[in-house]
Amino acid sequence: MSTNPKPAYRRVLLKLSGEALQGSEGFGIDPAVLDRMAQEIKELVELGVQVGLVIGGGNLFRGAGLAKAGMNRVVGDHMGMLATVMNGLAMRDALHRAYVNARLMSAISLQGICDSYVWAEAISQLRAGKVVIFSAGTGNPFFTTDSAACLRGIEIEADVVLKATKVDGVFTDDPVKNPDAVLCHELSYDEVLEKELKVMDLAAFTLARDHDLPIRVFNMNKPGALRRVIMGEPEGTLIHHVSK
């Protein structure tokens, strides 16, 4: 256990991509990855941190390709929303198997499968120490799950949005294509926009900026990274308002 008993954050919104759940698989959900993530989230709960969770659906369905082939975008986005519900069901089950209380809420009504999203109920569940998984995005087409993460983060008054990725944070360039790309440890919202750094889509990012919601980008595949972020240790990239 860490010698520092106090986490840096009281309530967080953790955003996981659907691709993160597929691990080395090309599609679907890798059970080992799912269970590891559930254990890491359990650590946060044991530290007394309130955790809201948004998971993408890209491991199960991507509407963009089908939209190019002629599918109606609204239909494709509705299918994507259902993919996030499937991931949410898998994560809720993994958390329950790890003896973590979790509730799955959906922005669209799916009676008998999960609860409908109600703001006051979500707050109540978080205060009770339960992990609340927000699924089905915002419930509207044309909005990404990053937008959903920022929206729910603002609604639940999270201290930060933790965006889990496959890289160590935000780089000056694509680290896969450019080996000279440098990791940025701290950025202002304006710097991200001016330098056109890839953090999340513009609608999601400006929503966070306009409501002064900090974003920390980190590598979820790095063992212990999530805990280090929560304990306030230098990990990944912090994006926030930087006073001049």
UniProtKB/Swiss-Prot annotation:
UMP binds at residues 57, 77, 138-145. The keyword ATP-binding applies. Allosterically activated by GTP. Inhibited by UTP. The keyword Cytoplasm applies. It catalyses: UMP + ATP = UDP + ADP. Disulfide bonds: none annotated. Its main location: cytoplasm. Residues 23-28 are annotated as: Involved in allosteric activation by GTP. Gene3D superfamilies: Acetylglutamate kinase-like. Pathway: Pyrimidine metabolism; CTP biosynthesis via de novo pathway; UDP from UMP (UMPK route): step 1/1. It comes from the Bacteria. One of its GO terms (biological process) is UDP biosynthetic process. One of its GO terms (molecular function) is ATP binding. It is found in: Cytoplasm. Pfam families: AA_kinase. GO terms for cellular component: cytosol. ATP binds at residues 15-18, 58, 62, 165, 171, 174. Keywords: Allosteric enzyme, ATP-binding, Cytoplasm, Kinase, Nucleotide-binding, Pyrimidine biosynthesis, Transferase. Its EC number is 2.7.4.22. HAMAP family: PyrH_B (MF_01220_B). Catalyzes the reversible phosphorylation of UMP to UDP. Belongs to the UMP kinase family. Homohexamer. This is Uridylate kinase.
